[in-house]
């Protein structure tokens, strides 16, 4: 026996979801009058992937789902103000599609379009991500040396935090402000030192008339090491990272990376003190009047987008 499937039959198969607890993302192809709905709790509390070949409409599908979530109504047909969606947009695809419902944070923001500048504090990155933000290769031993230097600076500047953590709880991954200028300057200075007496740091040959400046990323100058074992003597404890530090300095001066290193009130002074903090940054990201916050990474330099 063959029966025609009715709308009521399709409702039993595809329907049954509470409208207040679900979102509509279109119509079921078998019946244009039947909404395709997704249980919102099941959807957002689980990992979800939208897959398809190039040009199949993945971005459009994501936009439809996000718009449906952003425009949900409560039982009295009012907007649900607590909706908060954080969208990481590597290719700048969603700002135009979702502009009515979103606040965009972008590198080199266009304020005429009400975009806000995207800032990502270097000191809040895990150490591995921090060190990978600079070009050049270093050995595992050299990396551990820099990790320890970062750790010590975070421990030192933690005293400026509102709630001071114990030293044992702090790691190089802890999101504690420290001065990247001072880190570079100290590492660079140690590599360049020469001594009048072999192995005697107190006999450094620092040129006092041409001292460096960490804020300007200007190195200290020392008398070059002598030839044939003559004074001045090289610093035998140097780690051999001067080439890496030169590349690091170039990256810090590169204005394309100001979103990472030039941070306004989130950039620490040489002691590690800041006037802003992460709580204000996060509040700025998710405390907007719009339900969707888009972090547009399309202008982030490709060198660090791997």
Regions inferred by a protein language model and the residue ranges of each:
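Conserved P-loop NTPase catalytic core
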Residues: 109-116, 130
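Glycine- and other small-residue-rich loops at beta-strand/loop junctions that grip anionic moieties
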Residues: 39, 119, 298
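Conserved AAA+ ATPase "SRH/arginine-finger" region at the nucleotide-binding site
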Residues: 107-111, 120-124
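Charged, amphipathic alpha-helical linker segments immediately N-terminal to NTP-binding catalytic cores
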Residues: 1-27, 39
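A generic secondary-structure signal marking the coil-to-beta-strand transition
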Residues: 21, 34, 291-293
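Glycine-rich phosphate-binding loop of nucleotide-binding enzymes
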Residues: 24-108
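Flexible, glycine/proline-enriched loop segments at strand-loop-helix junctions
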Residues: 53-56, 117, 133-134
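P-loop NTPase motor domains
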Residues: 92-98, 102, 122-306
């Amino acid at each position: 026996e063959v029966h025609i499937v009715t709308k009521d039959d399709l409702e039993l198969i595809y329907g049954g979801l509470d409208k207040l607890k679900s979102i509509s993302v279109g119509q079921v192809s078998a019946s244009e009058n039947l909404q395709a709905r997704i249980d919102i709790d099941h959807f957002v509390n689980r990992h979800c992937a939208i897959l398809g070949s190039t040009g199949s409409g993945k971005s459009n599908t994501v936009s439809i789902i996000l718009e449906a979530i952003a425009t949900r109504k409560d039982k009295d047909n009012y907007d649900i103000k607590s909706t908060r969606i954080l969208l990481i947009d590597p290719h700048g695809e969603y700002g135009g599609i979702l502009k009515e419902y979103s606040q965009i944070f972008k590198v080199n923001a266009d304020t005429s379009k009400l975009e806000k500048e995207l800032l990502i504090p270097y000191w809040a990155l895990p150490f591995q991500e921090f060190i990978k933000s600079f070009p050049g290769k270093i050995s595992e031993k050299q990396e551990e040396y820099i990790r320890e230097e970062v750790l010590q600076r975070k421990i030192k500047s933690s005293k400026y935090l509102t709630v001071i953590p114990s030293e044992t709880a702090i790691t190089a991954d802890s999101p504690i402000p420290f001065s990247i200028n001072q880190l570079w300057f100290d590492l660079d200075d140690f590599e360049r030192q020469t001594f009048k007496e072999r192995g005697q740091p107190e006999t450094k040959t620092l040129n006092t008339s041409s001292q460096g400046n960490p804020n300007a990323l200007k190195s200290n100058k020392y008398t070059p090491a002598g030839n044939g074992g003559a004074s001045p003597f090289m610093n035998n404890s140097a780690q051999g990272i001067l080439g890496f530090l030169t590349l690091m300095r170039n990256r810090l001066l590169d204005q394309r990376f100001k979103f990472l290193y030039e941070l306004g009130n989130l950039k620490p002074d040489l002691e590690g003190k800041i006037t802003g903090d992460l709580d204000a940054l996060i509040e700025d990201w998710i405390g907007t009047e719009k339900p969707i916050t888009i972090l547009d990474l399309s202008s982030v330099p490709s060198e660090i987008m791997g």
